[in-house]
């Protein structure tokens, strides 16, 4: 699964996920992309599950790019622990997603195959997505 190799600080504040994606909002590497239209978080497990769904559907054809990286640690306290006594330990990593962000890209497969692969992948993600293709002249 994806996670940072090293971090300067183990824990991070919660923060607020606002605005729309100004970077990573167009198909850059492949011919087709999966664009999020919702705001939220994608965990490393969800990204990996979606990647596997795409890989299994396109079999050996095509090349896949993952355009998001889970670099934000989410901490949790153990079950049945009383409030207080500091912040919990980092349990997993998430990628903050704004509307318009491209999550996956693919090249080397027909459009219908890419569409179906992304449909299967979007079922693994908690956000609404849409299928996009590269603009002419890009």
UniProtKB/Swiss-Prot annotation:
Record field: compositional bias (Basic residues): 1-13
Region Disordered, residue ranges: 1-22
Any one Pfam family match given in the protein's UniProt record, by short name: Ribosomal_L16
GO CC annotation: cytosolic large ribosomal subunit
PROSITE patterns: RIBOSOMAL_L16_1
UniProt cross-references to CDD domains, sorted A to Z: Ribosomal_L16_L10e
Segments traversing the membrane: none
Keywords: Ribonucleoprotein, Ribosomal protein, RNA-binding, rRNA-binding, tRNA-binding
Record carries keyword Isomerase: no
Family annotation (InterPro entries): Ribosomal_uL16, Ribosomal_uL16_bact-type, Ribosomal_uL16_CS, Ribosomal_uL16_dom, Ribosomal_uL16_sf
Biological process terms in GO annotation: translation
Keyword presence, rRNA-binding: yes
One MF annotation (Gene Ontology) recorded for this entry: rRNA binding
Role of this protein: Binds 23S rRNA and is also seen to make contacts with the A and possibly P site tRNAs.
Family label: Belongs to the universal ribosomal protein uL16 family.
Complex formation: Part of the 50S ribosomal subunit.
NCBIfam families assigned to the protein according to its UniProt record, in alphabetical order: rplP_bact (TIGR01164)
Name assigned to this protein: Large ribosomal subunit protein uL16
């Amino acid at each position: 699964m994806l996670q940072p190799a090293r971090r300067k600080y183990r824990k991070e504040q919660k923060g607020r996920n606002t605005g729309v994606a100004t970077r990573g909002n167009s198909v850059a590497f492949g011919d087709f992309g999966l664009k999020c239209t919702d705001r939220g978080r994608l965990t490393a497990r969800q990204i990996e599950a979606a990647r596997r769904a795409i890989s299994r559907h396109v079999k050996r054809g095509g090349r896949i790019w993952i355009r998001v990286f889970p670099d934000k640690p989410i901490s949790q306290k153990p079950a049945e622990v009383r409030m207080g006594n500091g912040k919990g330990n980092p349990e997993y990593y998430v990628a903050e997603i704004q509307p318009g962000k491209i999550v996956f890209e693919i090249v080397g497969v027909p459009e219908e195959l890419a569409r179906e692969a992304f449909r299967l992948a979007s079922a693994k993600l908690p956000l609404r997505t849409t299928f996009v293709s590269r603009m002419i002249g890009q």
